């Protein structure tokens, strides 16, 4: 049954109010049933016992001697997972009243923050872990990975000392540790519980050597298919992988009481949870410590959990090289010191086009352009929307501003912190909340791009796209996106470019009908047909599919070459103030031209497309918020008027505030809108 606007608001608005319900002043837990699900990957974990009476733990405090296997009572009827869950819950209750600024958010204790970005939390977790290891004199080294999360390799034999060091460093703090086996997460404990927790899970094998090669990935990993980051995120590598290594038979003889299967802990993921609004930074921001296995009698070591760029085996874990992450140097395994071919090491910019339809000066310019063209208005296809002016491509929804730019910038700051500079292309407009002095942001007016042409003011995205290669100081590699396209979760440069600089492009499943533009075609379809025909005439390739509404990875040089080669075909598009059936689509042209000339390759990311006047699509936004399954998504204006503009704006604003609660560094602090947001959050 479609969700009507009132019900939709009731579903989305509680997302922004959860902080209030989940954070009572006395620090007691909020109502879990009312909280939004955490943004963590599914885990293969046995049920945990919550808030129950627990026996004396195998350890009393972090930093004490590691629990011994003989301390584990075989008569306890609960599984190790149930015992650890009960012990963790009891300890969380003790900590909750003693840690300022820490609240319970669903299943974690978390710092309550307002401005923290995911990359800052990832880098912060890495810094804390590396410092704890350095202080304990424990060698470690960064392992490059396509996932944004950081990985550290730990030498064979160092696991007990590492567990003790982490427990001591994070004693009495709301810092968590996921216990990792190859291909799955075993369970989650407080970091201060690590030595005893690992001992409890492995108590059936008291005689197993600390770095036993039985069950190592050396034999089992070679036949596994590389899951890779290329097909979109494996949101957590512990969910849904096959190829778990064989486990040795460690059943103790004649043991009384229940016998639980022993699990081998091959790594730990350390993270300090933080919550902003309803957004939890949890294990996806953690730092992975992998307890590598010895390759004896051969030299080197074998990765315990995930493959490396060189496979599972490396000749040495020496880490004399360094790499800089978040402005800090870290030891890097020597074997990875050389630049790898898949690594992107060139700067990447972003270009965003934006318009504010509420600006009176812009409205006057648009009205004047309408008046000049009114007597030559082209017929309008239904799916383009009907403009009051009667001019094709001039429907109001094409220029509607719902403050999407604010959240588009938040998405880039949160999920693509590697962007060097953002270029905002506007028609002499700047939102009041934008920090135009920020060194990572440049505002580019249309008149600067169209200088030297006879084109007047333009309200045509196609015309603007013909001039993007002229943006001053634009990097050779950049992402082009409209302000209604949002990065949905952390991505890496390799999601958009190959290491050799070649952009990836994202074709849609939609097919443009064969043939040239016809009178009944929409402006969009006509422009796509015109583009396809011009390209086919030049390179002999016909592209049936259009492109997704995505961030478009582009090379400035290819865009400029395309503009020059197709200058005659683009002549009228450059000078068309509104979208018309005679236009070409310049970005589509450049991308397909790059592909036809072997300078662009097809890529894949998980995407979402939502039409804001569709009740069904708006209802799906709640699921997107909860699960965060999209690498990017588009909130497109509809033309069917199923919901009023006011209803659409309310639903979209509620969703975007909940999905991107952390301000970007491009927002002025203390603006009226920010104050309104804070007042709304505090209710």
Regions found by a protein language model. Give the residues of each.
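Intrinsically disordered, low-complexity repeat/linker tracts enriched for polar/charged residues
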Residues: 37-38, 42-43, 47-51, 55, ...
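Long, charge-rich alpha-helical interaction segments
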Residues: 497, 503-577, 581
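P-loop NTPase catalytic cores that bind/hydrolyze ATP
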Residues: 568-600
């Amino acid at each position: 049954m479609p969700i009507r606007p009132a019900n939709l608001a009731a579903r989305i608005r509680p997302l922004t109010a959860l902080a209030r319900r989940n954070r009572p002043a006395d620090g007691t837990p909020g109502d879990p049933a009312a909280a939004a699900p955490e943004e963590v990957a599914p885990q293969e974990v046995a049920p945990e016992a919550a808030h129950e009476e627990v026996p004396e733990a195998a350890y009393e405090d972090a930093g004490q001697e590691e629990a011994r296997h003989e301390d584990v009572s075989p008569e306890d009827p609960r599984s190790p997972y149930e015992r650890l869950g009960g012990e963790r819950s009891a300890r969380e209750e003790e900590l909750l009243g003693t840690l300022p600024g820490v609240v319970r958010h669903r299943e974690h204790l978390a710092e309550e923050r307002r401005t923290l970005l995911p990359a800052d939390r990832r880098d912060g977790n890495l810094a804390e872990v590396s410092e704890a290891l350095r202080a304990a004199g424990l060698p470690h080294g960064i392992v490059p990975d396509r996932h944004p999360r950081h990985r550290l390799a730990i030498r064979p034999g160092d696991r007990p000392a590492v567990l003790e060091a982490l427990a001591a460093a994070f004693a009495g703090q709301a810092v968590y540790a996921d216990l990792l086996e190859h291909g799955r997460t075993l369970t989650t404990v407080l970091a201060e519980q690590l030595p005893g927790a690992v001992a409890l899970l492995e108590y059936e094998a008291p005689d197993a050597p600390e770095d036993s090669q039985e069950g190592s990935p050396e034999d089992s990993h070679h036949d596994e298919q590389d899951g890779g980051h290329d097909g979109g995120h494996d949101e957590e590598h512990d969910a849904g992988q096959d190829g778990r290594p064989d486990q040795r038979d460690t059943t103790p003889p004649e043991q009384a009481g229940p016998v639980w299967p022993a699990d081998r802990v091959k790594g730990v993921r350390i993270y300090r949870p933080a919550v902003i609004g309803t957004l939890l930074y949890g294990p996806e921001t953690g730092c992975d410590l992998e307890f590598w296995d010895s390759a004896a009698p051969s030299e080197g070591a074998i990765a315990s959990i995930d493959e490396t760029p060189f496979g599972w085996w490396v000749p040495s874990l020496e880490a004399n090289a360094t790499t800089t992450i978040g402005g800090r140097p870290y030891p890097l395994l020597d074997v990875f010191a050389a630049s790898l071919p898949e690594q992107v090491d060139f700067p990447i910019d972003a270009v965003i086009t934006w318009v504010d339809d509420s600006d009176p000066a812009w409205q006057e310019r648009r009205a004047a352009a309408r008046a000049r063209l009114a007597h030559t208005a082209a017929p309008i296809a239904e799916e383009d929307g009907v403009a009051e002016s009667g001019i094709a491509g001039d429907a109001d929804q094409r220029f509607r501003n719902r403050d999407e730019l604010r959240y588009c910038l938040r998405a880039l700051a949160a999920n693509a912190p590697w962007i060097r500079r953002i270029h905002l292309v506007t028609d002499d407009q700047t939102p009041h909340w934008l920090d135009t002095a920020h060194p990572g942001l440049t505002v580019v007016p249309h008149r600067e791009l169209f200088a030297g042409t006879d084109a007047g003011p333009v309200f045509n995205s196609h015309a603007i796209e013909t001039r993007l290669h002229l943006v001053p100081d634009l990097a050779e590699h950049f992402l082009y996106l409209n302000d209604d396209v949002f990065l949905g979760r952390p991505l890496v440069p390799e999601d958009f470019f190959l290491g050799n600089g070649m952009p990836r492009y994202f074709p849609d499943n939609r097919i443009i009908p064969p043939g040239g533009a016809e009178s009944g075609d929409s402006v969009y379809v006509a422009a796509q047909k015109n583009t396809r025909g011009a390209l086919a005439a030049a390179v002999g390739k016909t592209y049936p599919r259009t492109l997704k509404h995505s961030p478009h990875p582009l090379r400035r040089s290819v865009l400029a070459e395309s503009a020059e080669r197709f200058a005659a075909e683009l002549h009228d598009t450059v000078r068309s103030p509104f979208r018309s059936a005679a236009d070409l689509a310049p970005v589509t042209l450049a991308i397909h031209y790059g592909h036809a000339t072997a300078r662009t390759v097809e890529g894949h990311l998980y995407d979402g497309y939502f039409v804001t006047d569709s009740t069904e699509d708006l209802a799906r936004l709640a699921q997107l918020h909860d699960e965060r399954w999209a690498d990017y998504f588009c909130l497109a204006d509809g033309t069917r008027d199923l919901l009023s503009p006011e209803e659409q704006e309310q639903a979209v604003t509620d969703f975007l505030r909940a999905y991107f609660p952390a301000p970007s560094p491009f927002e002025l602090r203390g603006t009226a809108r920010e104050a309104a947001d804070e007042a709304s959050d505090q209710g």
